[in-house]
């Protein structure tokens, strides 16, 4: 018996595991470690120097250095020199890193609701209201939920 070929509109759950394209698994290979996400949080807040990132995250220097190297190799952050003698670098988000902003907001929102008793911060939109991140289709404006998403093979 052979596995069914993906067809337009097929739901991912209907595909055998080996046939599922898994961008999520690939993203988790880059981002899925605690210290990576916490380092990205700090860099996104404007903390660019290694010692300050280590201080705010609580990561050991060895672990943080490893995670920053991996994030740089994946193109999520870049190092920029700020001192020649001794040579020192700052860390900045690349375009790929900046595009993680909505992902981080969604994780904050989930954590505020499900992972802590009382959130440490209230995030507000520029309109003054507490931030509520929703996902909507950019084409039709309708909410995106697990039952409104259909997958089809990417065109070659």
Q: Each PLM stretch: what is its role?
A:
Residues 22-63:
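N-terminal helix-turn-helix DNA-binding core of bacterial DNA-binding proteins
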Residues 32, 83-106:
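Basic, amphipathic "hinge/linker" alpha-helix immediately C-terminal to the N-terminal HTH DNA-binding motif
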Residues 37, 74, 103-114:
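Alpha-helical linker/hinge and terminal dimerization helices associated
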Residues 50-82, 86:
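Canonical helix-turn-helix DNA-binding module
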Residues 56, 90-92, 122:
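Short aromatic/hydrophobic contact patches that present stacked aromatics
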């Amino acid at each position: 018996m052979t596995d069914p070929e993906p067809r337009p509109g097929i739901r991912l759950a209907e595909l055998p595991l080996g046939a599922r394209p898994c961008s999520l698994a690939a993203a988790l290979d880059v981002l899925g470690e605690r210290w990576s996400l916490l380092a990205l949080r700090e860099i996104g807040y404007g903390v660019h120097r290694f010692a300050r990132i280590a201080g705010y995250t609580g990561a050991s220097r060895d672990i943080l250095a490893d995670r920053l190297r991996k994030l740089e190799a994946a193109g999520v952050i870049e190092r920029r020199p700020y001192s020649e003698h001794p040579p020192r670098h700052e860390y900045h988000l690349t375009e790929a890193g900046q595009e993680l902003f909505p992902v981080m907001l969604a994780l904050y929102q989930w954590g505020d609701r499900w992972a802590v008793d009382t959130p440490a911060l209230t995030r507000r939109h520029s309109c003054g209201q507490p931030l509520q991140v929703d996902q909507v289709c950019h084409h039709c404006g309708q909410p995106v939920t697990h039952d409104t998403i259909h997958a089809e093979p990417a065109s070659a």
